[in-house]
Structures are given as C-alpha cells and as structure tokens.
Amino acid sequence: MALMTGEQYIESIRNMKMQVYMFGKKVENPVDDPILRPSLNSVRMTYDLAQKPEYQDLMTATSNLTGQQVNRFTHIHQSAQDLVKKVKMQRLLGQQTAACFQRCVGMDAFNAVYSTTYEIDQKYGTSYHENFKKFAAYVQEHDLTVDGAMTDPKGDRSKAPHEQEDPDLFLRVVERRPDGIVVRGAKAHQTGALNSHEIIIMPTISMGPEDKDYAVSFAVPMDAEGIFMIIGRQSCDTRKLEGSELDVGNAEFGGVEALVVFDDVFVPNDRIFMCGETEFAGMLVERFAGYHRQSYGGCKVGVGDVLIGAA
C-alpha cells in the first residue's frame, strides 16, 4: 500500500469502532466532535506533509524491513542521520501545527521495543523480536498511526506493582491461554490514543521477579474488544462549543489525552513482545526515554518557533 493521504487517514479513523467517553457520555462520532477534531487535524498533518515532494526527505524513509518507502513515524532508525532527520521532521511539524502531533511516542516505542525484544530473545530463545518485526512491517505496509502507552495509574508510588492494594493500578496479565494472554488495567495520559490505529503497551518502571504479571509488552488495535477511552479535559475545551472565535486557543490543531482502560482484552501470541521477563522492563523504559527526550528537542522547538514568530 502507498503512503496514505491525510483524507484517507481521517476516513480510516472514522471507520474504526472505538469506545470513547467524554463528560460522562459516549461520543458516537469522535472524528467530527468539535472538541476532539483539532487533535485529529494535527495527526493528519503528518500524512499531508509526507505527500509533498519538498518534505519527503524528512517525512519518509526506506524501511529496513521491506525496502519500501514508509512514513518516518513508522521507521526503525538505522543511523545517526536518521535521528537527525527525525528531530528536523518534528521541528517542522511543530512549526506547521503549533501543537502536539501525537505520533512521537509511538515512533519512540517502535525503536525501543525493536531492540529490547532482540535482547530478550538472545537470552531466552523467545520469538518476541520476530513478532515485533512482523507487526512493524504490517504497520508500515498500511501506513498506520501507533500510540505508545507506558504510564500506568500507579497508585502508591512507594510500592511495587504487585504490592498495590488494587492489583489493576498497573496493567497486568490476568490469564494465559495457549493462543495468547488476557490483560487488565489502564494506561493514563495517552496523547493521541484517540487518533491511532494501534497501541503498543510497555511497562512503566523497573520490576522484580514478583512483578512477573506486570512485565508485559504487546500491540492491539485501538478498537479491540474491551478497550475504552475516557477523555481528559483542559480548562478551555468547552469554549470550542460556544460559537465564538475568541479565546479558543489553537482552533485548528491540538492534542487530547485519554485514560485507556483494558477490560480483559485478549492479545494473540504473535502480538506479544514481552511477557514476564521482568529484568528487561527497566531496559525498555530506559531506551524509550532516551528516544523520547530527543523527540522533545524537536517538537517543542517547532512550537517555540511559532510562539516567537519565527516559523
């Protein structure tokens, strides 16, 4: 499949069956909701710019998995130059949207999970790396947006996951089957989950042997059965409903966060990238954090360019 256009991206999200709740009610049409639409427009820009010849060197790359042209947000970095182009792409998008364009966490998760799964397989002879490569090739082929999910609700932060009074404050495996696992819990503050086709789950802290059920990484579609999104709000959100052009902030672009709840969600074996290998949880968090700190050096600078009139 060729790179999607922005309009094709919008329609692909419209065709999904996501369970979205806001202000205590189910949102039947998230794509056209006036509060939520600006965040979708921000992601659309990552597709629109990839179609323009003058930006393709930054916005696209050659896949190491397929040899095909892919959106850079789905690319596995192969060189220092890839990292330079990544941060330049992020600055460009910050200049174009003056907002969060929501795909950085997924891209950084891609690269962290790619290398960590290789390390796990080397030690345990598992097939996580092959699982992830197949998933990544699928994402690239269909030009999908992926949400990277790391932050758990956590509860008492002085205690490990297995010590929490409520065992679901960290996302965990509650059942193991011959064909996969069942997970329960939530991921918090998920910018862009609403506008993503897939979600990659990662552990949020280093873990010990007693936390085996919590050391889990996998990917599922955002509209998988049992996933619910509860939209968090910002102070001026409802001003977009008042019909005025005053004090609505960035009217065209924006970001929106969700609490993503997993109510006994099934994950097939070929979508599992870690399951119980607790000593690798910290490695995955650390590698992700390194990539994501670099991302902030691109997107925030681009938004800063807008704020000082230099975009």
Task: Name the predicted role of every residue range.
Residues 1-49:
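N-terminal-proximal low-complexity accessory segments that begin disordered
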Residues 186, 190-241:
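A short core secondary-structure module
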